[in-house]
Every structure is written in C-alpha cells, then in structure tokens.
C-alpha cells in the first residue's frame, strides 16, 4: 500500500514538472562563436550604430518648457472632468446591499448592479466602481 502511494506521488511530481517545463520557452544553447554566426539569421552589422549626442542648454530649456506645458494641460484636463448627473430614483427599486433576486426590480443606485452567488441563491445590490 505504501509502495503504491509512493509510486503515485512520484508520478504526480513528474507530471507536474513535465507540464511546467513544457510551457517554458526553449533556451538557445550555443556552444561557441562559430555556431552563433552560422545559426544567426540576423547579421549584427545590419543594424545602424548608435551615436550619443550631448544636449546643449537651449535644448534642455525647450524640453523643460514642453514638459511643463504637458503637466499643466493634464491638470486642466483633470479639473474639467465633471461628475455625470445621476438619474432620478425610481420608486420600485432595491437598496444597496439588499436582496435583489431576478424577479425583483433594479437597484436604486445607478452605479450598483445585482450580483448573484451560489447558483443565484444569494443576490445583492453592490457598487462596483467608486468613481461612478
């Protein structure tokens, strides 16, 4: 009995390792520089060289001004957002955190929705988004 459990446990560990290993991307193992040149489909000389250029004071000032303009425009845009008007409450509705099984009317809060759990046996109105 213990031998069969040990065998099954070993088999389970092997299968877990095999599935995890099969989902990993294959690693390229190149032995030397010659195989790198022969196996490489992209020649490194095809890419242009990178040149590093120092910025002068004028270009730094211009880039700072552009960054400040972007920051101020983002602040103005965030201040311009206005909360949308809420719809008037209808009389037959379900309050937040109360039961709202499907034959019941909709939730009173426009940001709330009816969420059911346990195969639609326990349903309640819940607010999902705080920014609504």
Swiss-Prot record:
**Sorted alphabetically, which keywords does the UniProt record give?**
Disulfide bond, Glycoprotein, Knottin, Secreted, Signal
Signal peptide range: 1-22
Q: What pairs make up the disulfide bonds?
A: 93-108, 100-114, 107-125, 111-132, 116-123
One Pfam family of this protein, by short name? Agouti
Question: Which regions are flagged for Basic and acidic residues bias?
Answer: 63-78
Q: Which InterPro entries match?
A: Agouti, Agouti_dom, Agouti_dom_sf
Is-annotated flag, keyword Kinase? Answer: no
Q: Which GO terms describe its cellular component?
A: extracellular space
* Domain Agouti residue range list: 93-132
* A single BP term in Gene Ontology: melanosome organization
Residues bearing glycans: 39
Offer an example of a GO molecular function term for this protein: neuropeptide hormone activity
Q: Where is this region: Disordered?
A: 62-85
Q: Where in the cell is it found?
A: Secreted
Protein task:
Involved in the regulation of melanogenesis. The binding of ASP to MC1R precludes alpha-MSH initiated signaling and thus blocks production of cAMP, leading to a down-regulation of eumelanogenesis (brown/black pigment) and thus increasing synthesis of pheomelanin (yellow/red pigment).
- What information about domains appears in the record's comments? The presence of a 'disulfide through disulfide knot' structurally defines this protein as a knottin.
Q: What is this protein called?
A: Agouti-signaling protein
Q: Which organism is it from?
A: Pongo pygmaeus
